[in-house]
Structure formats: C-alpha cells, structure tokens
Amino acid sequence: MNVFIGGAWPYANGSLHLGHIASLLPGDILARYFRLKGEKVLYVSGSDCHGTPIALRAKREGESPRIIAERYHQEFKKTFTKLGFSYDNYTKTDNPFHHQVVQSIIKKLFEKGYIYKKQTKQLYCSKCQQFLPDRYVEGICPVCGKVVRGDQCDYCSSLIEPTDLEEKRCKICGSSPVIKNTEHFYLALSEFSDELKRLLDNNRGWRDNAIKLSTRYIEEGLQDRAITRDLNWGVSIPFEGYEEKRIYVWIDAVLGYLSASKEWSRHTGEPWQNFWSEDTKTYYVHGKDNIPFHTLILPALLRGAGIKQIPEKIVSSEYLTIEGKKLSTSRNWAVWLPDMLKNYQPDSIRYFLIINGPEKKDSNFSWEEFIHSHNGELLGAYGNFVNRTLVFIEKYYNGLIPDGKLNEKIKEKIETLYHRVGNKIEKTNLKNALEVIFNFVREANKYFDSEEPWITVKEDKGTCKDTIYTCVQIIANLTNLLSPFLPFSSKKVRGFLNIDKPDWKYIEVLPATKLEKVEILFPRINKNLIKEEREKLGVN
C-alpha cells in the first residue's frame, strides 16, 4: 500500500510555536507508524515563503522577502529535526522547481477553461500607491463583526474578499483605502460544485470540523476565487502582460504537495505517480483554519488538472490556547519552539501535544500541566517501569536478562495492543491510542508491584526470573508501540536492550542478552520552573 501524508506549510515569517506543532505532529506519527508496518510512505511539507505575511515583515524590517523567508526556512528545518519530524522531503515554495510545477498546473487549468480573466474591484492605498492584497488590509468581518484580515475570518471561518470588509484600513500606513478597477485571474470553483459535493458525501475519514465547514461552503454556493494578487513576491502568473501579478499564496502552497513529491522523485528516482493515484491512502494534516484549502481548493485544482488523488483523510486539528488565552504572535502570547527545545525534551513536548492536544476540540497548554505530564506520566509511569526493571537486572543478574518464562496472558495482551493501537492511529484517534498504551504501562507497574520481585529474588528465584523476563518483553514491545509517538526515548530504550530497530509486531529479547549502560529515561523537571515560565509569558 502507498501512503501519502501532506503536512501544512508554515509561513516563513516567524519562529514555529506550539500551535503550529500541535496541528502538524499527527503527520509524523502517521508516517512513522506506516513505515513500521512496512508500507511505502511519502511524507512531505515545506516552508511557505510567499504571500503577504512575509512581504509585510520584510517591509517592516527593511529586508527583502527572500532573506526573511530563507532565515525562517532554515530555522524551521532545525526545529522539525530536533522534534523528530521524519519528512521524506521538507522543501520550500521559494524554489525554481516549485514555481515550474505551479505554473504548469495553472497553464493546464487555463487551457481547459477552469481559470479565466476578469475585471474586478480591488482596494488601493493612495498613500502607499499600491493595490492591497488580502493581508495588507484589516477591517470588520461582515459575517461576525470581529476585526480580521482581508482573506479569512479566524472567528467564523468565512472566506472574505477585502472589499467586503467594513471600516477597512491599510496595514502598512493605517489609512483608508479606495476601490479601483483591476484585472485578475479566477479559478472557476463553482464548476466543481457537484464533484466536491460527491467527495464530501463519500468521505470516510474527515474530521467533523472539516465535514461541517465544507458542507456549509457548498450549501451556501461555491464562489469563483481570484487566484492572483498584485504583489512583486511569489510565483509569477505564466502569461505575458501580467508581470506584476503573483499567484495567490494558498493556490501556490497546496500545489506544494505535488511539487514536493515530484522533487522527491527527482532526488530518489522513485516514481511520484505511485503516491498520486486514486488508490493511494492519503492524509492531509493541518489546522482548522486551513480546511477549505484542503477540502475544496486542492481537490478542484487536482481534478481540473486531471490528477486522480483525492484527500481521503482530512486531519484538521482545532486551536491550542496558551494559559487559557488565544495564542497571539503579534502580542508574543506564544510558546516558541526554538526556546522550548533548549530546556525540554522533544518527547515531552510530543507527548503533551498528543495526550492534551486539540485533536477534536480546542485545548489548552499550561506550564503546570506540561510539567505535571512529564513528571507524572513520562517519568512516573513509563520511565519508572523501565528504570526499576532494568536496574533490578543490573543489581541481581549482572546486567544479563534472566532465563525466565513469559506470562502468556501478558503476551496475548501485547499482541492485541498492536492491532488495537494501530487501528486507532489509522483513524487518527491519536490521543486515544496513546492513552491505551499508557493504561498498559500503568498495568505493567501494577504487575511488577504485585509480583514483588525484591522478595522473590531471595525466596523464589524461578518466579522472580519469570517476572523480570516478562517485564523485559513488555518494555521491548513498548519501544515499538511508542516509537511513532516518542521516537527519542524509544530509541534510547532499544539501545539498553540491544534491539536493532523498531517493528510493528510482537518481539522478544532473548535470555542472557547483555544490557547496555542504563540511564534515567526522563529526568524530573523542577516544579519551580512553572513560575519562571509563566513569568516569561507575562502571566500574573
């Protein structure tokens, strides 16, 4: 089976924060899991280097957009690597090959009549002497009345035209813009209404928020969307006479999944088409603000271009708040990953964002809960079980796994876990999958306690060997089951047990296997850091 996983492309206009990672992490877990099963996986993403957020930052800093985008692209790559993201290709939109792929799709759609030119009205700032694309404008949402940018409302999820905003103002100078005529290229999205409705009706793996929002758009009637902007930064429209126009960043970005796949193919020699056919298992992983671009825009572009892949699974996470408040990068109300990774283990971050993440509803990050989950679950449950078992072997068996008899009921339980957890992962019920594993970890600790090996090692040596041998097999299989979620600590424990690589099936470590140097898996985090971290944020 071929499995394609596309992770949303973060804007390269600032550092990655926990909100980004909360929505993107499911992609890495899926990729690691399917590889363990032996499936062929292509997992791609990249930095979105175009669009108004980067152009605006560049203007503020007096730099070129390319310098800003490249700075954060390089930082993103380092951050994702430190967090254990296992992309097969992490690329960027500021890439000549990507430009070629996007332009070729645009030409094909234009030739087929799915893209057309149209005179339209657009906001123009007389003071700045330029047209104002979407994010260059701020105003009142005509649907819900909140202050929003000119392309999309994050409050009611409406797609907006800048001219529809009330109390409009230019984000560069603050003045009120006027309306001028201009010409743009449009995607005939309305032509795909019936096909997109069928796609929605036949979905079997979209999250509820994706189904509800996409249904709303289709029932309200799909509107043709402008696919160009008056900018000097981005992918050029491939037609003469329109040199000042660039392709809308979200058309550009979602076609990045295709260009990243083709780029991967060029580097590896593997055919990209294997992951873009109708029978490919696909997962698109992103936040709920990106839903319409993945459930409506992307399928329309692919269908129009004659590409048969469909978004089978839409993994659209809800929002993450920080200490009970909405995350805001402009107010620096965020937890930035480059800073967090200096002080905390990547597996601690990964664990928290799955077990407490915004999988199906908004969730909250607090420093108190984060440190509690590390000390209570990773250290207190999992780390404790691994440490107490392996230290016992070092103390009483000279570091050699004893020749004991495996508890058959526990073996059956482990074998069942592979199927049960795998099924939940494939359905993207990741929180529940991890809960099931940690429930088993707690059962393993109870088993150790009830068997009392510290007593039987003196009074019933055979029973003690059976207990410890069984505990070793529990640990060995936990390294497999937890590998998609906690890759760093799983690798470390495999090193303790001399296990070569993970697998998604029951394994046993042989008696007399020599333990490598056993270390503490998760050091305790000082609770005083809760206050320090909250003060850094500015929490009273």
Swiss-Prot record:
One of its GO terms (biological process) is methionyl-tRNA aminoacylation. Zn(2+) binds at C141, C144, C153, C156. Pfam families: Anticodon_3 (PF19303), tRNA-synt_1g (PF09334). Its EC number is 6.1.1.10. ATP binds at T329. Keywords: Aminoacyl-tRNA synthetase, ATP-binding, Cytoplasm, Ligase, Metal-binding, Nucleotide-binding, Protein biosynthesis, Zinc. This is Methionine--tRNA ligase. The gene is metG.
